């Protein structure tokens, strides 16, 4: 029930990764990457399905060898979410997975080889209508660019990206997106800002090697939040040294916080103090776990007392304002006659939220695959 995002998205061209639209106003796609051995087909398929379950629009899979390429063929047959093959060093692997129905090829300009090899990949991608991601990384720039700039800079990342954008332009290939990732927030942000002014193609956002679950989430939220608030970005990945499922959750939380794209429940909860009349922290944690399966966008406020409780509840789909023994319950901003027992709020509120989610119009849900 909160206001729509004031962010004006950067205008970009449109590509498709499988059936997922990227750019030109399409919802920002959230993706992750498997961390299993790709040759372990069962483990990789299981992880992809777990990512899809929490909302992943696209999943990237590392394909470091020809054996991994053969495994990719089997994996692709067992999942429905679009797959990006992550290719480094050996361009021939890209040609191989293209035969196996890959939905997008990620190549690293710093190690994929000379222009002739890139031409081979582009020709294959064009023939099979496969988009490419030019994935520049501050830790693996071309040797001549490293020598020129001495250290990763925004200008260095931009030069690497534009070098390969120019190659694709010369080859008359426009089905690509670009990323210029760095582990330093300001370096990444400055690089993306420069790139956004240079090209019209979609941009894939990320703070690479951001760190563990807590610190990496914060670093990613700061960096990507800066860019997204400026309208920059068409797809994103949160790079965490953690379960990839967490990357998807954090990605959606960032988009939800900026009101760019909502999926599931947006909990507004107080940090608690001695005025709380029910256990807010335990209630939030339990409801988050129980309601992970819901995709309907909803705002639910859980405030432990009457100081801010009524005000937050009045601008939420549902809200609780803590009171002695029984707390006030609000729906669509209106206080209801029904009150919730403070010792049983979780069960009561879960039932109300599920019923409300079932009633909300499907027009409020974003199906990224149905965007024209």
Swiss-Prot record:
Residues that bind [4Fe-4S] cluster: 270, 273, 305, 312
Any one GO molecular function term: 4-hydroxy-3-methylbut-2-enyl-diphosphate synthase activity (flavodoxin)
Pfam families: GcpE
Textual note on the cofactor: Binds 1 [4Fe-4S] cluster.
Catalytic activity: (2E)-4-hydroxy-3-methylbut-2-enyl diphosphate + oxidized [flavodoxin] + H2O + 2 H(+) = 2-C-methyl-D-erythritol 2,4-cyclic diphosphate + reduced [flavodoxin]
Domain of life: Bacteria
Top EC group: oxidoreductase
Biological process, per Gene Ontology: isopentenyl diphosphate biosynthetic process, methylerythritol 4-phosphate pathway; terpenoid biosynthetic process
The keyword Iron is annotated on this UniProt entry: yes
Enzyme Commission number, as recorded: 1.17.7.3
InterPro entries with a match to the protein in the record: Dihydropteroate_synth-like_sf (IPR011005), IspG_bac (IPR016425), IspG_bac-typ (IPR004588), NO2/SO3_Rdtase_4Fe4S_sf (IPR045854)
Keywords, ordered alphabetically: 4Fe-4S, Iron, Iron-sulfur, Isoprene biosynthesis, Metal-binding, Oxidoreductase
Cofactor requirements of the protein: [4Fe-4S] cluster
Annotated pathway: Isoprenoid biosynthesis; isopentenyl diphosphate biosynthesis via DXP pathway; isopentenyl diphosphate from 1-deoxy-D-xylulose 5-phosphate: step 5/6
UniProt xrefs under PANTHER family: 4-HYDROXY-3-METHYLBUT-2-EN-1-YL DIPHOSPHATE SYNTHASE, 4-HYDROXY-3-METHYLBUT-2-EN-1-YL DIPHOSPHATE SYNTHASE (FERREDOXIN), CHLOROPLASTIC
Family: Belongs to the IspG family.
Function recorded in the entry: Converts 2C-methyl-D-erythritol 2,4-cyclodiphosphate (ME-2,4cPP) into 1-hydroxy-2-methyl-2-(E)-butenyl 4-diphosphate.
Protein name: 4-hydroxy-3-methylbut-2-en-1-yl diphosphate synthase (flavodoxin)
Source organism of the structure: Aliivibrio fischeri (strain MJ11)
Lineage of source species: Bacteria, Pseudomonadati, Pseudomonadota, Gammaproteobacteria, Vibrionales
């Amino acid at each position: 029930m909160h206001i729509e995002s004031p962010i004006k998205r950067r205008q970009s061209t449109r590509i498709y990764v499988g059936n997922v639209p990227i750019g030109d106003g399409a919802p920002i796609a959230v993706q992750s990457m498997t961390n299993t051995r790709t040759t372990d087909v069962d483990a990789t398929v299981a992880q992809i399905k777990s990512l899809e379950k929490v909302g992943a629009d696209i999943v990237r899979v590392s394909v470091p060898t020809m054996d991994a390429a053969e495994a990719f063929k089997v994996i692709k047959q067992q999942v429905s979410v679009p797959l990006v093959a992550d290719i480094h060093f050996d361009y021939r692997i890209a040609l191989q997975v293209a035969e196996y129905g890959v939905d997008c090829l990620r190549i690293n300009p710093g190690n994929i080889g000379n222009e002739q090899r890139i031409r081979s990949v582009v020709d294959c991608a064009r023939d099979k209508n496969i988009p490419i991601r030019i994935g520049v990384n501050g830790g693996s720039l071309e040797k001549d660019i490293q020598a020129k700039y001495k250290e990763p800079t925004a200008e260095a990342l931009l030069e690497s990206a534009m070098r390969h954008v120019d190659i694709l332009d010369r080859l008359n290939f426009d089905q690509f997106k670009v990323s210029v990732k760095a582990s330093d927030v300001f370096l990444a942000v400055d690089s993306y800002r420069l790139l956004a002014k240079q090209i019209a193609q979609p941009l894939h956002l990320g703070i690479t090697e951001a760190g563990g679950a807590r610190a990496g989430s914060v670093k990613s939220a700061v960096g990507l939040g800066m860019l997204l608030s400026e309208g920059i970005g068409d797809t994103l990945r949160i790079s965490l040294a953690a379960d990839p499922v967490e990357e998807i959750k954090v990605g959606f939380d960032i988009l939800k916080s900026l009101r760019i794209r909502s999926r599931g429940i947006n909990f507004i909860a107080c940090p608690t103090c001695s005025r709380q009349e029910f256990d807010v922290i335990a209630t939030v944690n339990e409801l988050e776990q129980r309601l992970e399966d819901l995709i309907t966008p909803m705002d639910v406020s859980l405030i432990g007392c009457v100081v801010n409780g009524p005000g937050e509840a009045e601008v939420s789909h549902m809200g609780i304002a803590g009171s002695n023994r029984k707390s006030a319950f609000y729906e669509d901003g209106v206080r209801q006659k029904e009150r919730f027992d403070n010792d049983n709020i979780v069960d009561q509120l879960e039932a109300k939220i599920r019923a409300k989610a079932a009633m909300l119009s499907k027009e409020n849900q974003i199906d990224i695959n149905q965007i024209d």
